[in-house]
Amino acid sequence: MKLVYFASVRQALGKPEETISVPASVTTVGGLATFLAAQGPAYAAVFSDPRSLRAAVNQVHARFADPVSDTDEVAFFPTVTGG
């Protein structure tokens, strides 16, 4: 699965993208976020609060309940806030 990171997510993880293998039990965007949160302190800081993130699967905005597969490209980016 190809993961792409934008803005503060990219800064926190120190990389713009990566390709990973995920367990067969990871079937949703939310499941992927939970899996990633367990991959180390930087990942935990980014993925432990899904309310602070948005995602896209194959360049289409996705909800955390939406399905993912190992052939997908999943992008994570911070929520947009305004002032």
Model-derived regions: residue spans:
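Ubiquitin-like/PB1-type beta-grasp interaction modules and other compact soluble beta-rich domains
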Residues: 1-82
